Amino acid sequence: MPSLKTLLRGVLVAAMLVAGSARAELNIEIIGGGASRHAISVLPFKDEGPTQGNLTPVIRNDLALSGAFRLIDPSAVANVPFEPADIRYPLWQAAGAQSLAIGKVESAGGGQIKISFRLMDASQRKQLTGGEFTVTPDRSRQVAHAIADMIYEAITGQKGFFNTRLAYVLKSGRSYALQISDVDGQRSQTILRSTEPIISPSWSPDGRHIAYVSFASQKPVVWVQDLATGQRRAVANFKGSNSAPAWSPDGSKLAVVLTTSGNSQIYIINAAGGPARRLMYNGGIDTEPAFSPDGSMVYFVSDRSGNPQIYRVPVNGGNAQRVTWEGAYNVSPKLSPDGKTLVYIRRSAGNFRVMSQDLATNDSRQLSDGSYSERPSFAPNGRMVLYSSDAGGQSVLYAATADGSSKVKLAVLNGDVQDPAWGPFNNP
C-alpha cells in the first residue's frame, strides 16, 4: 500500500505521466439520468437564426447535463408555439411534457437582438418564469446559459450553475496548458502554457483569480494569476516544495503545503503573499488542505494514524479531529457549499473512487465508476461534483449529480484533461 509520501510524490508529478495531444475545447457526452427528472421541451425560438445555433441547442444541452431534466423532442409534437396563446397543452401533456420553454428573437437595432423567453407549466397553463435580454448576437451563448439558469431555478428551487466556469489542465506532448471554459466545455481560453507541469488550479471565491502550482523554476511554486489582466505573482516560493493551494472563503488567505521544516505541513499565507503561519505541529505528513465554507475549519489529509485519512482542525490551530473512518486510504477532501457533505477519493481493491460523505451521519456513497478518479470538487450550488477519471486509456472529466444518479463526460478527442476545479457563482 503506497504511503502518503508516495501519494504526494504522485500528485506533484502526475502531470508528467499523461501523454497525448489535446484539442482546445471539450466534447460533452450525457451518460444516464435519474428516475425523477423533470420532463421539459425547449422549443425552437422564433427567428433564432442570428444566434447561429448558440441559443436553444445550448439551453437543451445545459438542462440535460444537469441530470435534473428529461428533454422531450419538440419535433415529436405537431405544435410549434412562440407565444403562450399558441400552445396546445393537451398535445404536450400527451407527450409527457411537464413544462415548455418558448421564445423569440427580434432585432433591437444598433446591431443588437432582443431574446425573449417564457417557461410555461403544461398542466397549470401558467408562466413559471421568463425574461428578455438585449445583446449583440455574439453574446447569445451567455444568454442561453442565463435562460437555462432561470429554468433550473424555477423547477428545482436551486440556483443554476450554467454561467459558471471550469478550470483544468490539458496535456499535449510535452506542453501543459491551464485552461478555463464554460461549464459545457465551450469558449475555452488558455491562461498559461508551459513545458513544465502545471497542477492544482484553485479558484478565488470571487472568480477573478486562480491559484496553481507551476514547476517552471524546476520546483513546485504556488502562483496566483489575475484572469482579467493575465498578471501573476508567486505567493509561495519558500525553500523546498510549495503546493496544494486552497482559498479561504473570504479570499484573503491561502492554505498551502510547504516542506520548509522537512515533512509536508500546512501553512496559512495572505493571498498577496508574505510570511507563512504553520497551522499544526505534527511529526507526520499533512497535505491537501480545504477550508470549510464558513472559514472556521481546515480539512486535510494526514498519515498520523498510519494510513492517509481526512481530518479537520480549527483555522487558528488546535486539536485535529478525524473525519473518515471507512476505508484505509482517503484523500483529496472538498466540502459542499453548505458544509454538510464531504467528497474525497477512496482507494479500495486497487481502485480510486469518488466518495460522498454526509458529515452529520457519516454515511457515504460512491459517485464514480472508473479505476482511477481524482480531484473532486462541487458545483457552486452543491448539486454536482466534478472530477477527472480514466476512460479507455484517456484522462477525461466527469460531472456527476451529488446523489450519483446521473453523470456527463467531458473529453478532448486525442488528449488528456486533468486537475479540474469548478468555479464560483461570481463569474466576472
From Swiss-Prot:
GO terms for biological process: cell division; protein import. It is found in: Periplasm. Keywords: Cell cycle, Cell division, Periplasm, Signal. Belongs to the TolB family. The Tol-Pal system is composed of five core proteins: the inner membrane proteins TolA, TolQ and TolR, the periplasmic protein TolB and the outer membrane protein Pal. They form a network linking the inner and outer membranes and the peptidoglycan layer. Part of the Tol-Pal system, which plays a role in outer membrane invagination during cell division and is important for maintaining outer membrane integrity. This is Tol-Pal system protein TolB. It comes from Chromobacterium violaceum (strain ATCC 12472 / DSM 30191 / JCM 1249 / CCUG 213 / NBRC 12614 / NCIMB 9131 / NCTC 9757 / MK). The gene is tolB.
